[in-house]
A protein has these predicted regions:
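Surface-exposed, glycine-biased beta-strand/turn segments
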Residues: 18-87, 91-96, 104-109, 117, ...
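A cross-family detector of function-defining hotspots
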Residues: 100
């Protein structure tokens, strides 16, 4: 019985700690060329939910250009009067996805892509899922 219990504990220990995932240390670059000060942290308690990202202060300036934290492709674009407002999702080769929300303006290429879809749908609110070859982005 002791041997069986020991074996079960070892197996349980293996499965519990083999789930630990190493995240890349120097893979991602800052998304803006300003000092990064946070106004909202991941997981902080909001009125009816936990905050699902980090909010970066923009020194009171609107329209600061946002850069992709790493190379990848735009996998989702969502424009809504709620939530993130204008948001873009970038999938990176390492399997991570970065989300950029509360965006004032997209790049010219992405703006044209969105506007064409909005006119086609005849709606400001839109959710798009571009193919991986359509909107490639580079780090920075």
């Amino acid at each position: 019985m002791k041997n069986l219990l020991s074996i079960l504990l070892i197996i349980n220990y293996h499965f519990a700690f083999s789930q630990e995932k190493k995240y890349p240390q120097d893979y991602f670059a800052p998304p803006m060329d300003i000092p990064l000060y946070l106004s909202g942290n991941f997981g902080e308690i909001r009125t009816n939910h936990f905050h699902a990202g980090i909010d970066i202060k923009t020194q009171g300036v609107e329209g600061i250009p946002i850069k992709s934290a790493a190379e990848g492709f735009v996998s989702r674009i969502k424009i809504s009067p709620y939530g993130y407002g204008k948001a873009i999702y970038v999938v990176h080769p390492n399997g991570y996805t970065t989300v950029y929300g509360h965006i004032q303006k997209f790049s010219e290429t992405i703006e044209k892509y969105i506007k064409a879809a909005q006119y086609k749908k005849e709606s400001f609110s839109i959710e798009l899922f571009p193919m991986s070859s359509e909107l490639q982005v580079k780090k920075g």
